[in-house]
Design a protein with these regions (language model features):
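Active-site-proximal loop->helix
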Residues: 1-4, 23-24, 105-119, 134-137
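N-terminal Rossmann-like dinucleotide-binding module
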Residues: 1-31
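Rossmann-fold NAD(P)-binding glycine/threonine-rich loop
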Residues: 44-47, 78-91, 100-120
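Conserved anion/nucleotide-ligand pocket segment
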Residues: 128-177
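Redox-cofactor binding/interface segments in oxidoreductases and associated redox assembly factors
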Residues: 35, 73-75, 147
């Protein structure tokens, strides 16, 4: 809100909160809107009186990636936005990613694709962004980085159990299923 003259929001999306999206559209004069949920999209159309520049369903969100956009913030949780994630990277746009699941499940493929398309994936989650910044500014001069976890599939497990955790167990997160 403090930088409306410096930054312009070209497109915005939501799953179901069409009323909040409509308020944001009005405040920031957003031209293109995407709504995943069909019922929410119908309600949005009733509220706004138009379906012009409205894209319905996650499958259509990639149509919002246009030349007039420099950075795309992806903040859809889970694995449902994986195709959108790939489309953003293929477009060469900078991807601000507030989603851990896409990186954890397909990180090497996404990073390789980003290099091929000469773009960046910038993690927005605070811990991941801190690591990203350290790696960017120190030219990968670290031998190892340890990330602590607050729960997931290992919540309430004893330290002795954690010594033998497999990658398969680690991705079996109760929320990511």
């Amino acid at each position: 809100r403090n930088n409306k003259k410096k930054y312009k929001i070209v497109a915005a999306t939501c799953n179901t909160n069409y009323a909040k999206l409509k308020k944001l559209q009005k405040e920031y004069k957003i031209k293109k809107i995407g709504i995943n949920n069909k019922n929410a999209a119908k309600n949005y159309i009733s509220l706004s009186g138009s379906d012009k520049n409205l894209f319905i369903g996650n499958d259509n969100f990639s149509k919002l990636i246009t030349k007039d956009i420099d950075v795309i913030i992806l903040a859809i949780s889970g694995l449902s936005p994986i195709n959108i994630c790939f489309d953003i990277v293929k477009s060469g746009k900078i991807l601000g990613l507030a989603n851990k699941e896409c990186i954890i499940s397909l990180g090497p493929r996404l990073i390789s694709l980003a290099k091929r398309h000469k773009t960046k994936i910038v993690p927005l989650d605070s811990e991941h962004n801190s690591i990203y910044r350290l790696l960017e500014t120190n030219n990968n001069k670290f031998k190892s980085i340890t990330i602590t976890a607050s729960g997931g599939p290992f919540l309430h497990k004893k330290r002795s159990f954690l010594k033998n955790v497999t990658p398969k167990q680690a991705i079996n997160h109760p929320i990511w299923k």
